[in-house]
Amino acid sequence: MTVRLRFAPSPTGYLHVGGARTALFNWLYARKMNGKFVLRIEDTDLQRSTKESEKAIIESLKWCGIDWDEGPDIGGDFGPYRQSERVSEGIYKRYAQILVEKQCAYYTVYDKVDRKKVLFNTFEYPEEYEKKGHDITISFRVPEGITKFHDLLKGNMEFQNSVIGDFVIVKSDGFPTYNFAVVIDDYLMRITHVFRGEDHLSNTPKQIMIYKALGWEIPQFMHIPLILGFDRTPLSKRHGATSVEHFRKIGILNMGLMNYLALLGWSVGEEEVFDVKEKLVNFEPESISNKGVIFDPEKLEWVNGKHMRMINIEQLWNEFVEWIKFTNRKIPHCEESYALKVLNVCREKVNTLSQLYDFSYSFFFDDYTLEERFVSEYLSTSYAKEILRKAVVLFSELKDWSIEGTEKVCRALADMKIASKNKVFQLLRGAVTGKLVTPGLFETLSILGKKRVIERFEKLLNSVDC
């Protein structure tokens, strides 16, 4: 038997990090078992579903590094992979009628004026009432007894059927409800394992009843604890941004996000920083924690920073350029060798691509702004002009433009005792970058190059505020 798993988002907004983690766990198990991973779009909510959201979700999944073997964009043997298209083909209607014929479901006719008022239930199709414009739904008859199933994470579960009560499976507009459509789709797409958030746990007995009524084999279920905010309630917009799109925009690497999401409930020994794809063989569904986990943006940034320093510098440059394009920022135009030097020294002090962009900006562009503290504490002093004048002279005479060479000039300027060494170094640092926190001063000067450094000193000397 081929193991088959799926991720089935509703296209009503951006991909939530909780959804991304669910997709990741499904993907990990499918790949580990040499099975198939299916993407299905559950777009039966006509008022909220949009093509724009579907496109955004697919783009976010691809960016996360999650690929699929079948889906709405690539097709497959068990399509269509959009529920709205499956409605058009009459798939759900066909199985709803089978349930009615077996008297496992029934039609409900509603009053034309008070559309919530039930007139009667029947196993016979009320064609006459349909012609008169009455709303008609199909509801599932919940049998007596207890519904039991084994959850891979939570163990043996049971629900009293009497507490659940009959439920609608086809709405008056002809569209299936979630609990009905998901059973039909999972069965016809031959899904063997259903991994999803524990907020779906209460839906499971309803779905199992439908499986049994149709005489179908039931897949294995696993319900994953939800990601929580710091107040231990399910992570939502009130806790701040929660979409994959947001974290991509602020400069989180896909490998950093996937690593962190994997840590939310799954562990690989003592390791906290790893490439998720390299840990496929270690993934065991039963090893996922059965407790809710808190989403910590600071820990995410920490993990991401580790990845930024782990990957080779060429890969970081490629990620950096793609992120700049994605966020529509100004692209550096320089030799790649120069860019690699800049990123190599700057990545040590940052944890996101956004921070890297801001931190490295003055290496790539001349229109950087001067920090207020630099201006007030160093540039607007009585000694600033004298040091900058002497810096222009000494750096112009420097033949050995290297880390060692620039260090000698900086120390020579400090030895003149015009100001303390710290004040001299901070003035020079701010003069060429606009910042008081940068990579090492001598390394910064060496990378920027003689021409750019002298031009920046001269520009400040000619400024009004200096």
Swiss-Prot record:
Where, by residue number, is the motif 'HIGH' region? Answer: 9-19
Keywords of this protein's UniProt record, alphabetized?
A: Aminoacyl-tRNA synthetase, ATP-binding, Cytoplasm, Ligase, Nucleotide-binding, Protein biosynthesis
Give the binding site residues for ATP.
K237
According to UniProt, the name of this protein is Glutamate--tRNA ligase 2
The record places the motif ('KMSKS' region) at 234-238
- Location of the protein in the cell: Cytoplasm
UniProt gene name: gltX2
Function per UniProt: Catalyzes the attachment of glutamate to tRNA(Glu) in a two-step reaction: glutamate is first activated by ATP to form Glu-AMP and then transferred to the acceptor end of tRNA(Glu).
* Disulfide bonding pattern of the chain: none
GO biological process entries: glutamyl-tRNA aminoacylation
The GO molecular function terms of this record are: ATP binding; glutamate-tRNA ligase activity; tRNA binding; zinc ion binding
Q: Which GO terms describe its cellular component?
A: cytosol
Q: Please report which protein family the annotation says this sequence is part of.
A: Belongs to the class-I aminoacyl-tRNA synthetase family. Glutamate--tRNA ligase type 1 subfamily.
Which branch of life, at top level?
Bacteria
Q: Which CDD domains match?
A: GluRS_core
Reactions listed under catalytic activity: tRNA(Glu) + L-glutamate + ATP = L-glutamyl-tRNA(Glu) + AMP + diphosphate
Q: What is its EC number?
A: 6.1.1.17
